[in-house]
Amino acid sequence: MTCCGCSGGCGSSCGGCGSSCGGCGSGCGGCGSNCGGCGSSCCKPVCCCKPVCCCVPVCSCSSCGGCGSSCGGCGSCGSSCGGCGSSCCKPVCCCVPVCSCSSCGGCKPCCCQSSCCKPCCSSGCGSSCCQSSCCKPCCCQSSCCKPCCCQSSCCKPCCSSGCGSSCCQSSCCKPCCCQSSCCKPCCCQSSCCKPCCCQSSCCKPCCCQSSCCKPCCSSGCGSSCCQDSC
């Protein structure tokens, strides 16, 4: 039996090829230097019938207790994995979204868009750059990761520069309660943002008729302008 990466049969460097190997197909192609070799901790013979022929077990011996049927075997990588190549930001043929390439700065979680691992929005940006643990577009202002005022499902900038958490309602993406382009406290009815009951640019008690906020009777009028809370 010919063992991939071993000329002239199966030598000690190959780790031997047993019946469990099942032969090596033409797609094996040998083991490159980027594999780092395989030691005694390998669950399977070196370079035996694994996708890309890199010496990385599908399941590590410590976590799986050996490569048995419970590990799911050494299956090929599907299209959802984006394939397995030397430039992949994923462990070889393990289809795990953890970056290991230079662009990701070592083994760190990635801000992923679609199925491709990309660096975070900005250098030094932490886990806040990502929404939950799922790969979604970053909620960022300019190049820095900050909380966003989101409308619907799309991340948009806050109403105004320097606007604080008051610009957003809770942690849910809803339109901001704002006057003009600046985030100011609103005269809101219930929890819904309605036109502010205001005189000029300041929120004051209103003279309301029915459920509609109308301007006070006269300019500069105080609380006597309103009847109770209605």
From Swiss-Prot:
<feature type="repeat" description="12">
    <location>
        <begin position="192"/>
        <end position="195"/>
    </location>
</feature>
<feature type="repeat" description="10">
    <location>
        <begin position="172"/>
        <end position="175"/>
    </location>
</feature>
<feature type="repeat" description="1">
    <location>
        <begin position="42"/>
        <end position="45"/>
    </location>
</feature>
<keyword id="KW-0677">Repeat</keyword>
<feature type="repeat" description="6">
    <location>
        <begin position="116"/>
        <end position="119"/>
    </location>
</feature>
<feature type="repeat" description="9">
    <location>
        <begin position="154"/>
        <end position="157"/>
    </location>
</feature>
<feature type="repeat" description="4">
    <location>
        <begin position="88"/>
        <end position="91"/>
    </location>
</feature>
<feature type="repeat" description="11">
    <location>
        <begin position="182"/>
        <end position="185"/>
    </location>
</feature>
<feature type="repeat" description="13">
    <location>
        <begin position="202"/>
        <end position="205"/>
    </location>
</feature>
<feature type="repeat" description="2">
    <location>
        <begin position="48"/>
        <end position="51"/>
    </location>
</feature>
<comment type="similarity">
    <text>Belongs to the KRTAP type 5 family.</text>
</comment>
<dbReference type="GO" id="GO:0005882">
    <property type="term" value="C:intermediate filament"/>
</dbReference>
<comment type="function">
    <text>In the hair cortex, hair keratin intermediate filaments are embedded in an interfilamentous matrix, consisting of hair keratin-associated protein (KRTAP), which are essential for the formation of a rigid and resistant hair shaft through their extensive disulfide bond cross-linking with abundant cysteine residues of hair keratins. The matrix proteins include the high-sulfur and high-glycine-tyrosine keratins.</text>
</comment>
<feature type="repeat" description="3">
    <location>
        <begin position="54"/>
        <end position="57"/>
    </location>
</feature>
<feature type="region of interest" description="14 X 4 AA repeats of C-C-X-P">
    <location>
        <begin position="42"/>
        <end position="215"/>
    </location>
</feature>
<comment type="subunit">
    <text>Interacts with hair keratins.</text>
</comment>
<protein>
    <recommendedName>
        <fullName>Keratin-associated protein 5-1</fullName>
    </recommendedName>
</protein>
<feature type="repeat" description="8">
    <location>
        <begin position="144"/>
        <end position="147"/>
    </location>
</feature>
<feature type="repeat" description="5">
    <location>
        <begin position="94"/>
        <end position="97"/>
    </location>
</feature>
<feature type="repeat" description="7">
    <location>
        <begin position="134"/>
        <end position="137"/>
    </location>
</feature>
<keyword id="KW-0416">Keratin</keyword>
<feature type="repeat" description="14">
    <location>
        <begin position="212"/>
        <end position="215"/>
    </location>
</feature>
